[in-house]
Amino acid sequence: MVNLGTAVRSLLVHLIGLLVWQFDISISPVAAIVTDTFNSSDGGRLFQFPDGVQNWPALSIVVIIIMTIGGNILVIMAVSMEKKLHNATNYFLMSLAIADMLVGLLVMPLSLLAILYDYVWPLPRYLCPVWISLDVLFSTASIMHLCAISLDRYVAIRNPIEHSRFNSRTKAIMKIAIVWAISIGVSVPIPVIGLRDESKVFVNNTTCVLNDPNFVLIGSFVAFFIPLTIMVITYFLTIYVLRRQTLMLLRGHTEEELRNISLNFLKCCCKKGDEEENAPNPNPDQKPRRKKKEKRPRGTMQAINNEKKASKVLGIVFFVFLIMWCPFFITNILSVLCGKACNQKLMEKLLNVFVWIGYVCSGINPLVYTLFNKIYRRAFSKYLRCDYKPDKKPPVRQIPRVAATALSGRELNVNIYRHTNERVVRKANDTEPGIEMQVENLELPVNPSNVVSERISSV
């Protein structure tokens, strides 16, 4: 525990030192406190940043990179290996995890390298526009995935029958391909522009950063603000529809009036509702109000609650993304609009900090899934123990299934023997001919509700 506390304290000191060095605030009282923290016991300084020396405290960011890569690999494994996560929404989340993992593999290390060399690009110059293009590609892919998830869930809840005709694994892959195609279309012009004119991707001929005001404005709106607006609107519409469906159920509406509910639970509830409606009433004196309540499908409310829980998890993901990336894009727009009226050095330093806050968002999503979803949490725990075997199937029990070889008479009153291979012959009534019934074995799970739960969103 002492070692852990020391490590955390050392990491915080490293990060504070990086911010102090980045913003050059050594004169302020806060910086004085930090300076004392960085002083060693013998009066020497723990970290110094003279000209030409790398910013070694920035290496603490390696922890963020490792967490980003490892967490998103766990998400990809969970969606690939857990059958309960095989639905359209989780396919989108797996594709989002791929984009976030590539941020940790290809974008964040080079950004860390730039920090170590005081934002002087140390690699071949032709790699600068390629790196910027990858940064824009994966950032755009993240917001586009969240926008597509929001749209897909709203359509599924608002028009379930129409959505079911186009909801399959192949269709989900096609939608994901469209998301990536849009992201590639936004990022491809950057290397073309940068290779033709290096001034578009270099500031002061040393710092690798996108330096085309027109592209910054257009790209920010196309890749962030427009998808963000669509995402927020559709998310609140989804919450509105779910609340309306809940109120309809609480007021006693039948399932015929709930045609807008999600198809995930529409299939499993309609059959049950029909059986209850056609079944004879054992108590003729039962009040109509009570009969109407029994007619209501029992699983519908639970399914709506599951949809609400899934929407809450996605809402947290949306909110985290909004909080993490809005400062960068707003500052990016302001730096272009205000031009020389703004303090450009301050803007550059703010952008350098805000872009890393956005990068951290790529590593937070797996934590959100772990905290709010039992399936992801159980899967992550298994994989961290190097247990990659699928879960065992639930135990089964045998129940008799009646297969009629001949039917006659209006009503059937057949007593089924427990033994499986017996032939049971009973008469429907005294005036009707005999009816031969055959009893067969049928295996079902002990808990049939598991079959229903697999059709419900597992986000």
From Swiss-Prot:
Major location (coarse): membrane
All ranges on the Extracellular side of the membrane: 33-56, 113-129, 191-214, 338-348
Region (Disordered): 274-302
Disruption phenotype: No obvious phenotype at birth, but mutant mice are prone to sudden death from seizures. When fed ad libitum, adult mice display higher body weight and increased adiposity compared to wild-type littermates. No difference in body weight is found when they receive the same amount of food as their wild-type littermates, indicating that the increased body weight is due to altered feeding behavior. Overweight older mice develop insulin resistance and impaired glucose tolerance. Young mice exhibit insulin resistance, but normal glucose tolerance, due to increased insulin levels in the blood.
UniProt GO BP: behavioral fear response; cGMP-mediated signaling; feeding behavior; intracellular calcium ion homeostasis; locomotory behavior; phospholipase C-activating G protein-coupled receptor signaling pathway; phospholipase C-activating serotonin receptor signaling pathway; positive regulation of calcium-mediated signaling
Record's bilayer topology term: Multi-pass membrane protein
Subcellular location: Cell membrane
Ranges per topology, Cytoplasmic: 82-87, 153-168, 238-312, 372-459
Record field: transmembrane: 57-81, 88-112, 130-152, 169-190, 215-237, 313-337, 349-371
Domain of life, per lineage: Eukaryota
Entry keyword annotation includes Glycoprotein: yes
SMART domains per UniProt: 7TM_GPCR_Srsx
Binding-site positions, ergotamine: 140, 210
Compositionally biased region (Basic residues): 288-298
Glycosylated residue positions: 204-205
GO cellular component: external side of plasma membrane; G protein-coupled serotonin receptor complex; plasma membrane
Assembly and oligomerization: Interacts with MPDZ. Interacts with ARRB2. Interacts with MPP3; this interaction stabilizes the receptor at the plasma membrane and prevents the desensitization of the HTR2C receptor-mediated calcium response.
Function: G-protein coupled receptor for 5-hydroxytryptamine (serotonin). Also functions as a receptor for various drugs and psychoactive substances, including ergot alkaloid derivatives, 1-2,5,-dimethoxy-4-iodophenyl-2-aminopropane (DOI) and lysergic acid diethylamide (LSD). Ligand binding causes a conformation change that triggers signaling via guanine nucleotide-binding proteins (G proteins) and modulates the activity of downstream effectors.
Family label: Belongs to the G-protein coupled receptor 1 family.
Entry's free-text remark on domains: The PDZ domain-binding motif is involved in the interaction with MPDZ.
Stated name of the protein: 5-hydroxytryptamine receptor 2C
Gene source species: Mus musculus
